[in-house]
Amino acid sequence: MSSTSFTDLLGSSGVDCYEDDEDLRVSGSSFGGYYPERTGSGLPKFKTAQPPPLPISQSSHNFTFSDYLDSPLLLSSSHSLISPTTGTFPLQGFNGTTNNHSDFPWQLQSQPSNASSALQETYGVQDHEKKQEMIPNEIATQNNNQSFGTERQIKIPAYMVSRNSNDGYGWRKYGQKQVKKSENPRSYFKCTYPDCVSKKIVETASDGQITEIIYKGGHNHPKPEFTKRPSQSSLPSSVNGRRLFNPASVVSEPHDQSENSSISFDYSDLEQKSFKSEYGEIDEEEEQPEMKRMKREGEDEGMSIEVSKGVKEPRVVVQTISDIDVLIDGFRWRKYGQKVVKGNTNPRSYYKCTFQGCGVKKQVERSAADERAVLTTYEGRHNHDIPTALRRS
């Protein structure tokens, strides 16, 4: 190609440069061969000169090509970093490259090391505090540190009440009634310990489940140590076809009458108030004192009995199925009275041991629920053995 002067370049027309565009050809794929060479007449040099390379900025030394491939927008969620759109945790780096948080221009929000501990601190502690607020402080005080002789009223919620309401103390039921503010009947109990004024109210549902217990007054004594009740296997066997029973061989105990029991049932104490709900409203105050009751029984037999207040003889109740009313137990008895009590149409007979100096008594009556069942209540303990004449027979 011949050299061309600067004057020729200025004289050439822009149209002439492109009039033979069909003769242009591309040589190779490099930038040097991108512009065609003219055949025939010469092509201006500035049209054949290679253009300078494009300015490409260098990437940061902290980034590699694999870092771009690890972008959350290019890869699946299994290789992506945690973000508002993916929500996943980072795995191992792409192509074996491991990246640190300091290598990235953005910083990830730190997550708690133990999610379960965070939840426990948020919810577990709050739930524990709520339960502590629901449990009355007086309940723990009553079980561990008794405040003797103090008047207080404690209401226990339903979720803390056990089915048999056994709290370690001896209780005697003296009444039951239906209150307006509750659909369940309420039973009233008094502590059996002498001179103790503590009482409790037990609310029971129709299915037998205890729904509420209310304590009134504090105990002025520690919890009694109960002895084990005699099992049915320890009852005396029959002699000459007749069933014998010796109350002196049985260790009686105070008991909670909220528990169902056919062996021990303080039936005589229910005379005054246990069935008053069928005839009228119940007064929550205790019935006449024990001393007055025993004096009344002593007047029936024509003799005076002086009993110190607070002394209560043990009671044992035996239920048998028999056609006869009197239970043959080996001792001699003398009948001194009979009457009909409320709640039972069958009469109750009163007997006293004929041995000189023995104050044991018994009451015999048929059950109101079952006419064949005979209830024999023994009060006191014999201070003598079975008479010899009866023992030989």
Swiss-Prot record:
Bias type Basic and acidic residues, positions: 289-298
Cellular component terms (Gene Ontology): nucleus
Induction or repression: By salt stress. Induced by heat stress.
Subcellular compartments: Nucleus
Main subcellular localisation: nucleus
InterPro entries in alphabetical order: WRKY_dom (IPR003657), WRKY_dom_sf (IPR036576), WRKY_plant (IPR044810)
Region (Disordered): 217-242, 277-303
Flavoprotein keyword on record: no
PTM annotation, UniProt: Phosphorylated by MPK4.
DNA-binding feature ranges: 160-224, 322-387
Keyword Repeat attributed: yes
Keywords on record: DNA-binding, Metal-binding, Nucleus, Phosphoprotein, Repeat, Stress response, Transcription, Transcription regulation, Zinc
Gene Ontology MF, one: sequence-specific DNA binding
Polar residues bias spans: 229-240
Tissue-wise expression: Highly expressed in roots and at lower levels in leaves, stems and seeds.
Consequence of gene disruption: No visible phenotype under normal growth conditions.
Top-rank lineage group of the source organism: Eukaryota
Family, similarity comment: Belongs to the WRKY group I family.
Subunit structure: Interacts with MKS1. Interacts with SIB1. Interacts with VQ10 and CAMBP25/VQ15.
Function per UniProt: Transcription factor. Interacts specifically with the W box (5'-(T)TGAC[CT]-3'), a frequently occurring elicitor-responsive cis-acting element. Functions with WRKY33 as positive regulator of salt stress response and abscisic acid (ABA) signaling. Plays a partial role in heat stress tolerance. Functions with WRKY26 and WRKY33 as positive regulator of plant thermotolerance by partially participating in ethylene-response signal transduction pathway.
Record protein name field: Probable WRKY transcription factor 25
Organism (species): Arabidopsis thaliana (Mouse-ear cress)
